[in-house]
Amino acid sequence: MLKIMLAVFLGGGTGSVLRWWLGLRLNPVHHAIPVGTLTANLAGAFIIGAGLAWFNRMTHLDPMWKLLVTTGLCGGLTTFSTFSAEVVFLLQEGRIGWAGLNVALNLFGSFMMTALAFWLFSSLSVR
């Protein structure tokens, strides 16, 4: 159990630091869309799609690795709470269109990235 907790902890810490760095570097890029948060959510969605497809095929791997990547890394990297707060801030500023675009980009973009990665990694041949 301690090994599993450590894997989730390490993955989560890595994902959280990466999310913080993306926000720091990319959120100032656009005046209304928090690009760092969007990038973190889309990257995390792609990684979890790829990870789920990969780990479904690589059944011989220790389940700890799946937890490190999916629960840990992706859980730390992606952020529904920050995304939600940023949408609320846009709404409070009267930027309804930007808030709607941010919702669409994060939600539909994440679904598409997960599906794309799952499809791509499911179609790879295992050697």
From Swiss-Prot:
Catalytic reaction annotation: fluoride(in) = fluoride(out)
Signal peptide residue numbers: none
Pfam families with a match to the protein in the record: CRCB
GO MF term list: fluoride channel activity; metal ion binding
Keyword field contains Cell membrane: yes
The keyword Membrane is annotated on this UniProt entry: yes
Transmembrane segments: 4-24, 35-55, 71-91, 101-121
Residues reported to bind Na(+): G75, T78
GO biological process: cellular detoxification of fluoride
UniProt keyword annotations, A-Z: Cell inner membrane, Cell membrane, Ion channel, Ion transport, Membrane, Metal-binding, Sodium, Transmembrane, Transmembrane helix, Transport
Location(s), subcellular: Cell inner membrane
Regulation of its function: Na(+) is not transported, but it plays an essential structural role and its presence is essential for fluoride channel function.
Membrane protein topology class: Multi-pass membrane protein
GO CC annotation: plasma membrane
Function, in words: Fluoride-specific ion channel. Important for reducing fluoride concentration in the cell, thus reducing its toxicity.
NCBIfam families: crcB, PRK14196.1
Membership in a protein family: Belongs to the fluoride channel Fluc/FEX (TC 1.A.43) family.
HAMAP family found in the cross-reference section: FluC
Protein name: Fluoride-specific ion channel FluC
Organism per entry: Cronobacter sakazakii (strain ATCC BAA-894) (Enterobacter sakazakii)
Taxonomic lineage from the root: Bacteria, Pseudomonadati, Pseudomonadota, Gammaproteobacteria, Enterobacterales
